[in-house]
Amino acid sequence: MKLILRRLFLWSWVLTLPLAITGGYLIVRTLDRFYTFQIRYDPRPINTTLGDNLRYEINHLLQTLRVKSTVRGIRQQTDLPRISLVVPEANLAQLRSHMPQSGFQYATGGIFIDGKLKKAKIKYRGDFSYHWRWDKKSIRVKTKKSALFEGLRVFNLQAPKNSKQLNNFLSLKLAKTFNLLAPRTELVRHYLNGTDRGIYFFVEQPSETTLRNANLMPGDIYRGEMVGKDKYSFLGLKSGDRRWLFDSASFWDKVAINNHYNPRSFAPLKKLIELTKAHKAEQSQAALSEIMDMEAWGRFSVFETLASTKHSSNSHNWRLYYDPWRGRLFPLVWDPAGWIWSPRPSGFPVISSDLHKLLFRNSDFLRARNNALKEFFRSGKDQGFLRLVSDSIKTMETEIQTDAFLRPADVTKVTNAMHKLQKQIQTTFATTKKHWIGNKISGARFHYHSAGLDLLVDGNRPVQAMRLMFDEKLADSITAKVHFETPGGKKVVDLPSGIIETDPNSIALYASFLPDLAIDYEARPLAELQVSPGYYQITFTGLNSDLRLTGLDIDRGDGWVPAQPGDSITPT
């Protein structure tokens, strides 16, 4: 027995030495990462503990060993497009010399384009530490003008932000589904100096090229950022003294310039900010409809709802394109980070900035938003996008098996998280559709008396047309006026003759009537849209007051549905 114990002791180094080396390696890497990104650099609001860093190092090492033990991992096989970068070790050392600051300076390297190595510049990118704290770092690549990569000079290789992996990729794909101005994005495999660095998201950097690829004329692209590296300090200021993006154009810059105008000119943006400050003034809404492409903004709002994103806020993440030929501002979707937050509950409008508050008081915007919802669900685009989600997850399930830099480094955990994301998207779509459509009844009530109609419009959708049916033949010439209350007082609108159609026994009004919408500015964390019935009085000229109304149908986009009569209708 003593002999056996002596021999075990003599050979114990075979076990203890590798464990000691591995433990020392993990401790050194953990302390170095924690010191670099948590002590020497202030990473707020994204903080990590020493334990978080140690767990990352252990899990990363285990994932690397798992990948290296598979044939597919050893052969670096992938079904994704490959983007191969080459950076000399000395230049990589320069990038990593004093992280994160050193990483934001371009280093010289190369990129393979059509099998040929072309010169390029590479740096790390991203406002927050999850982009560059870990081994899989987000990268920006800039090629020479004479050697574009798939038509682009500047693009990003973004590392996934969380265990769901696909949030940004899928939300940018959803933006494209809405025909919004958004950067191109693809799932790719990144190789650095011949080594597989795992799954990345190829994302175009917004520029004049983005406009050309969208068949838009060159124009200014304004960028609004006040967080991360662009953060302004308001220390010592009271909350009422702080300033945000829609307080001043001074907080904005340009990422694309119309060279027909002074590069320092921000006139369209300044006009928008003036209107935002006067958002409760009724006259500001007419001016807003003049400078904003409301069809695009309506689609953008629906996109925000379906992507459950509040990432465009008073301090962050705005990109606005100004088309000088049409004189309109368009949203450009950037870094939407979809389905990371869960607005209360999913499916409700997102009102996350002063610009949102202004838009949700604009009737042209509200009608455009309704049209965007109708087109998305009625065209089957929702089902097409859900198929894209399913296909993307299937691709990822194969690719993450050989991603040594997967974070979190747990294939099962990542797979479950992606399927959870899929269910979250399905739920958001279903909830939004149900909330928008409402119940099967018309959602409108009316009372007719003496050639006048009192109408109450309830629900979330506008009435797009109405048809009044009478028991006797009508006169050939009938006009109508609509009376309704606004925050600025009572308004009377003469309906154009072109939207009034008369048949022998009926009148059709092809006018839009909205429910009453108000914004609760005090709600937290986001302002809330409160919906109540809209009250309208319609008076007819040329209509015999003795005629009896036999019925009233309304159309909210589903065809004619009978409205409910009432003995009287009073404003709510």
Predicted segments — roles?
Residues 32, 254, 260-313, 320, ...:
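Middle-to-C-terminal accessory/interaction subdomains
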Residues 2-116, 383-572:
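Regulatory N- and C-terminal appendages and interdomain linkers associated
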Residues 154, 180-191, 284-288, 318, ...:
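Surface-exposed patches in mature extracellular/periplasmic domains of secreted proteins
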Residues 102-161:
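Conserved oxyanion/phosphate-binding beta-strand-loop segments in alpha/beta enzyme cores
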Residues 133, 159-182:
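A conserved alpha-helical element in kinase catalytic cores
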Residues 140-142, 156-158, 189, 198-202, ...:
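Structural recognition of the beta-strand scaffold that forms the well-ordered cores
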Residues 152-163, 255-258, 262-265:
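Short histidine-centered catalytic/ligand-binding loop motif
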